[in-house]
């Protein structure tokens, strides 16, 4: 095979076609999105729902989204920062928090659709595979496809923790056990799944084990790294109870009460704006008619003087 040098001449640049902006920025995988959005031609006006999971440095965000010609429509959303109201005040980005966020999203969506009593899901998380579509129900469960964006889908990723939480919450998301923690392949390429290892991740046992290890090996680093846990009186033995209570609280009331809207306060007095630290002058913007009237007054004043 000969080496061909790419000649970037005028013809090259005339025929060059740039990729979509969000693909150039590394934000959207259009190859995957086209397959997640496209609906069968014989299913008229029936949306295709996606379970969108996004991970940031401080939060885990889960949404149920459907695509339209106008744009994407969000039907329900859950954020790991909301777990503070359910008893989880620290560790809002780990695998256990991702599971709680997925569970919160599922229960919130089913409550909104008034299907929470019909599709209860798996009340006690044990790490075993659970498919709500295998149960005998009067109607089909709510189906959504997992949308991971441009995230690398490695085994044990937190994205699949949110997936497991949504499935245990009563949603039908097609999946297998191959990407869950506890799945391994031997030398003969035979896979096996350890549900207990997955359960340990759901209840934060891996964090508790590291807390015990760090407490014995390096107490100063333990106090520094887990200072937020220690301020709340949490240790390695109380983490599992914290997540178990959070699962129970989420199922009791997945919908947070809406805050009343704050009343608007008039902070302007003429050209003065009042703040908590004092006041400052900001002239009121006049209208076009007022500007014209002011110009007329100046013209008439100049005419009278002359």
Swiss-Prot record:
Molecular function in Gene Ontology: 5S rRNA binding; structural constituent of ribosome
Pfam family, one: Ribosomal_L18_c
GO cellular component term of the entry, any: nucleus
Major localization listed first in the record, in broad terms: cytoplasm
UniProt-annotated location(s): Cytoplasm; Nucleus
Key words, A-Z: Cytoplasm, Nucleus, Ribonucleoprotein, Ribosomal protein, RNA-binding, rRNA-binding
Annotated GO biological process: ribosomal large subunit assembly; translation
Binding partners and assembly: Component of the large ribosomal subunit (LSU).
Entry-linked PANTHER family: LARGE RIBOSOMAL SUBUNIT PROTEIN UL18 (PTHR23410:SF12), RIBOSOMAL PROTEIN L5-RELATED (PTHR23410)
HAMAP family in the cross-refs: Ribosomal_uL18_A
Function summary: Component of the ribosome, a large ribonucleoprotein complex responsible for the synthesis of proteins in the cell. The small ribosomal subunit (SSU) binds messenger RNAs (mRNAs) and translates the encoded message by selecting cognate aminoacyl-transfer RNA (tRNA) molecules. The large subunit (LSU) contains the ribosomal catalytic site termed the peptidyl transferase center (PTC), which catalyzes the formation of peptide bonds, thereby polymerizing the amino acids delivered by tRNAs into a polypeptide chain.
Homology family: Belongs to the universal ribosomal protein uL18 family.
Protein name (database record): Large ribosomal subunit protein uL18
Provenance organism: Theileria parva
